């Protein structure tokens, strides 16, 4: 299947809704990598959505998880994932486990994933969901990783699922040469998804992928503010 070949419409309501999520939301938002599109058909998003919002599992919106956090919209998840070009030899760090759905997607592509969340409830529920999905190449940690997490590093890929007003340099230092990092940087209402790449010489370059606005990581590094 190439990037422009549409999938056939499934017969069941559940699979039909998943199909339309991929074809109408995700593919139309410049996500054309067939590996990513196929992955989003195979990994069951509804199994990671809080039961109160399960009917909205395929909706083009963020879903509340509690504790001020959200499950990102499907197209945002897909666009971030596509930009990282994850290989099956990559080690991945995820900051903000949340529902565990992005964790599952990352683990389906990479060799190993370390996912950290400051909320113990999220770590516990994600562990149950990942186990039910048969995903075993994930290490879940509970802790404050908003300003860095060196344990198990360095990494080939780092994903921040919450925004940061300023991207701490510690994350860049935790990247292997050739490593990629994606984060939403800025403060509401102006935030941008940025892809950071570390060169073989150790320098980092960043490109802006798209504009969005998502909740901040708890205890995120704040910019210096002038006082008058």
Feature annotation, model-predicted:
Residues 2, 85-205:
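Conserved nucleotide-cofactor-binding alpha/beta core module
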Residues 2-93, 101-104, 109, 122-124, ...:
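Class I SAM-dependent transferase core
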């Amino acid at each position: 299947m190439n990037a422009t070949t549409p999938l056939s419409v499934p017969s069941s309501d559940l699979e039909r809704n998943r199909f339309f999520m991929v074809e109408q939301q995700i593919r139309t938002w410049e996500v054309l990598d067939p590996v990513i599109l196929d992955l989003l058909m195979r990994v069951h998003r509804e199994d990671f959505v809080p039961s109160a919002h399960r009917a909205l599992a395929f909706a083009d919106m963020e879903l509340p998880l509690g504790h001020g956090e959200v499950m990102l919209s499907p197209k945002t998840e897909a666009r971030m994932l596509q930009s990282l070009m994850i290989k099956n030899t990559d080690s991945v760090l995820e900051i903000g486990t949340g529902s565990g759905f992005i964790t599952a997607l990352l683990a389906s592509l990479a060799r190993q994933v370390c996912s950290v969340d400051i909320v113990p409830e999220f770590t516990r529920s994600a562990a149950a969901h990942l186990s039910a999905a048969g995903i075993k190449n994930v290490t879940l940690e509970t802790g404050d990783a908003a300003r860095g997490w060196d344990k198990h590093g360095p990494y080939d890929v780092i994903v921040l699922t919450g925004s940061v007003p300023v991207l701490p340099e510690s994350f860049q230092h935790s990247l292997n040469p050739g490593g990629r990092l994606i984060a939403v940087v800025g403060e509401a209402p102006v935030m941008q998804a940025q892809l950071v790449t570390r060169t073989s010489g150790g320098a980092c370059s960043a490109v802006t992928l798209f504009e969005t606005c998502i909740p901040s990581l708890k205890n995120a590094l704040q910019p210096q503010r002038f006082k008058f």
